[in-house]
Amino acid sequence: ASKINADGCHMGQHDGSLLKARKILKNKIFGITCHNSKKLATNAIKNKASYIAFGSFFKSKLKQNAIKANLNILRWAKKNVKKPIVAIGGINNKNYKKLIRAGAKYIAISSFIWDNPKLKPELAIRKFK
C-alpha cells in the first residue's frame, strides 16, 4: 500500500504485524478482520486500526473456509467500539439490512458486485438502495 501511495489497506489476521503495518502506513486508512472475536478487536484498537471488520457472516465463494461470525459480535461492537464497524462475508442485497441493524456501519460486498452472474457491477450496486 505504501509503495503505490494507496489511501490505505485491509489486513487479515495472518497478513503480518498490526503494529508494523501501522508504522508503515502512518496516517493512512488501516483496517483489520477480527472474525468473531472481541479479543482481536480490542487488539486492533490498541494498534490504532482505522476500522474493525467482523465476519464471515454468510457463506461466500471467495473464502469458503472463513471463520463464521454472528450478529452478537456486531451488537457488542456497536456498544464498545468507537471505530467504524465493517461486516464482511457473503453479503448481498437480501441479507445486509440485518447486519446494519445489528451495528455494522459499513458492508463489504465485493463478491456480490464482481462475481454476480446475473447482474453487471453497476446494477448489482443499485440493488442496495
Task: Say what each PLM segment does.
Residues 3-7, 38-55, 97-102:
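Alpha/beta enzyme core
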Residues 5-7, 26-28, 48-50, 81-85, ...:
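Short, well-ordered coil/turn segments that N-cap beta-strands
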Residues 9-11, 30-33, 52-54, 85-89, ...:
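Hydrophobic faces of well-ordered beta-strands that scaffold small-molecule active sites
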Residues 13-20, 53-65, 96-129:
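Glycine-rich phosphate-binding active-site loops on the catalytic face of alpha/beta enzymes
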Residues 15, 19-37, 65-93, 126-129:
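Alpha-helix-loop-beta-strand connector modules within alpha/beta enzyme cores
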Residues 42-81:
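Ampipathic, surface-exposed secondary-structure segments
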